[in-house]
Amino acid sequence: MSDPAPLCRLDDIPDRGSNGFYTDGADRRLLYMAIRRGNEVFVYENRCPHTGLPLDFQPGRFLATDGALIQCSNHGAQFRIKDGFCVSGPCQGDSLKAVKTEIRDGHLYLL
C-alpha cells in the first residue's frame, strides 16, 4: 500500500466553502473538489455523472448560492454535500464519486 498523497492544507478550504485541486502531473484541470464543514471535509472527483464535465462555476466554486448543495455549472444538477447524491437535475439518483481522504497535522491527504 502506498503512502497517502498530500492534497492541500486544511486552511486552503474555507470553512463552509469549497475549493478545487489537481495532483502533480495532471493536465491542470481541477480533478478534485473539497467541501469543508468545520473539521470535516468531503472530497469528490470534479466530474458530473451526467456529462462528465467539471462541476465548478469558476475555479474552486462548487456550491449553490446558499452553500447548502453542490451544484453543477452545466445543467444545474444539485448534490448533497455529505454523500454526493444527486437530489435534482438530469442525473437525479446518481452520485458523485467520493475520494477517500484523511486529515492529519492540518493537511488533507488522498488515501
Where are these regions (language model features)?
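A short acidic, glycine-rich active-site loop
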Residues: 69
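N-terminal pre-ligand scaffold of iron-sulfur
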Residues: 1-66, 80-81, 95-111
